[in-house]
Amino acid sequence: MKKPTAIFLFIMLGCQLVSGSSDSRTAPVTDIDADVYDAGTQETTQFGVKINNTDSLTAGDRGPTLLEDFMMREKVMHFDHERIPERAVHARGVAVHGYFQSYEDWSNITAAKFLQDPDTKTPVFVRFSTVLGSRGSPDTVRDVRGFATRFYTEEGNWDLDAIKFPDLIHAAKPEPDKEVPQAGTAHSTAYDFFSQHTETIHTVMWALSGRGTPRSFRQVEGFGVHTFRFINEDRKTVLVKFHWKPLQGLSNLVWDEAQKIAGKDIDFHRNDLYTAIENGDYPEYELGVQIVSEEDQDKFDFDLLDATKIIPESLVPVTKLGKMVLNRNPDNYFSETEQVTFHPGHIVRGITFTDDPLLQGRLFSYTDTQLNRMHSANYLQLPINRPLVPVHNNQRDGFMQFNVYHGRVAYYPNALQDNTPSVVSEEEGGYLEYPENIRGRKQRGKHGKFADHFSQAQLFYNSLTTHEQQQLVNNFRFEVGKCDSKLVRQNFVDVLNRVDNNLARRVARGVGVEEPSPVSENEGETTINLSIENYKRPDHIRAKKVAILTGPGIDDSQVKEMKDYLTGENAYVDLVGLNLDEDNSEGLNITQTYSTTSSVLYDAVYVPSGEKRTFEILTSPRPEFPYDEPLMFVLDAYRHGKPIAVSGRGLELLKSAKVPTFNGTDAAANHGIYISSDVSNLASDFRKGIIIQRFWNRMALDHDAKKSPTSSHIKIED
């Protein structure tokens, strides 16, 4: 009993010493900066005690670890609790900082201040993600991507986010009996759900197209999914659908390429985004809205409140409100990317909700899931979640309360604190409510225009080019072919048949089920800006990745000339060789080897000329490339539609890989193969090919593939 008494007396003595100080008041210890910089410091415990040794405290050289080792106990305890529950969906993600700047004053349609001053740069935090996979899943799986954006405005935080509903996620997630497959829908429960819930077919068509496997987060569109309302100071409202339009254009991976990248670089999209920002090649997106007046909301063949539908841009064009620039990577992944908590209910003055049923469900779901992940109602006080404006309300206490509130009042109205924090009228800047008339009876089920599940799936299919439709067919053959239930395969093909008979018959043939007869007519209706192939491309190759293949005896002057040209155009160039750090006569280092990289990680490939022995080496088995990596490098680049430039004897590598070189340079160039020993002329043509990105005319088409009503038309910005 004596030892505990001594400790108690020591604590009491410490309290007496502090209270007896001559200082009238002690400075608060709660005003602590959240930023921590460890470089050049000394290691301490969590309580600030300097650590003298990181080995465990033991009884003798070989004795047991002592329980009194408080340093070891603290370290192990903290390690055991470092992980928090991952997100139920969108667990795999990457986030970056940036800013948004309005193009002009949009006060005619919204009271949101950040959309009224073109000189104001509003900070943003953007998280890109997959939906189905866990935190450790690959980046390049086929999935609907998340594109969540937080605007830190002068009127509070606004989150622009997207997600799907629970049953869909349960069906698409790994099957619960054996927890496979990871991060993919190529299994029976997913397609059983899709065939039983035909309202999903429009989303499934998008996911199985090239949009389900983007090349880069710098080249994806973002969609607000739901219909929201803008409300201005005069209480006038319009309905809006939000869009993010990438200024670097759109680009996608083919499925074979995406699978190989998952094995070569599981963090492919993360690395791509991080590298571009570190190099100053900042991703840029325009925020746009499709605007529909309250009077016109019922004039469409679909319901604006149906989140499974889009407003075709041929009916309502996108009005560009401003531009977002992403220019800074996070300082700490966990503190920022993992702890950020997006919520569609985080809106600001001038923006309000509609009766979209999926949106209404999300308003509950997000709060619930964030409480489960963060284990505290105070997660909004975390640095990444705090608004830039002061927060004053009567919400108190809870686990991990970070704030130290002063005063005796925590309620409203009150007399002791002159009714503060006070409410703010709409006229003085309070939130603007939309006075919507509500009528109707309580009921369940889908009614009216919500019951149309196929017209927009057909519109999407018709708006793809013929080669994009072939990719869709190929992808369905893979996914549906993975379903072990023939009943599920047949049911889903029957669903596809209600979209397009030619599509359904081609898929059916590949998955071993009966080819259906037509049940409806495809009228061939199309709309704009759904085809990736026809999406306008920027007239530059900034941040495009190009591999230059080398070997002993390669023409160093051609290597240097092409590399200098490409880097001058702000492309990223790797020299691929037998061993790292080898210098050629021009002093150019080998940055990758044939065993460390692959053409799937690049946008284009150049093969210079060289000595005869150069290509004898590159086309023969060697320890440096035991699996014919140089041959596979150019063959995969060709199969995946990428531009290939070649000089002189470099053609030997293509021929050995059985890459077609066509009859004549013009025919080859039409298929993205650029052949010339004049590197200056070759480089210019190669640049055009890199801008085009993919040459889908190399892809074989089904013998019975119908020509799409949407023709291929390459558009490059002026």
State the predicted function of each range:
Residues 2-21:
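Gram-negative bacterial Sec-dependent N-terminal signal peptides
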Residues 591-594, 598-605, 657-682:
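Structural recognition of alpha->loop->beta junctions
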Residues 485, 604-610, 626-656:
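Catalytic nucleophile loop
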Residues 552-556, 650-652:
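Gly/Ser/Thr-rich loops at beta-strand to alpha-helix junctions
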Residues 20-553, 560-572, 577-596, 606-610, ...:
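Active-site-adjacent core segments of small-molecule enzymes
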Residues 667-716:
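A charged, well-structured terminal subsegment
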Residues 558, 616-618, 654-657:
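Short glycine-/acidic-enriched loop or helix-start segments at secondary-structure transitions
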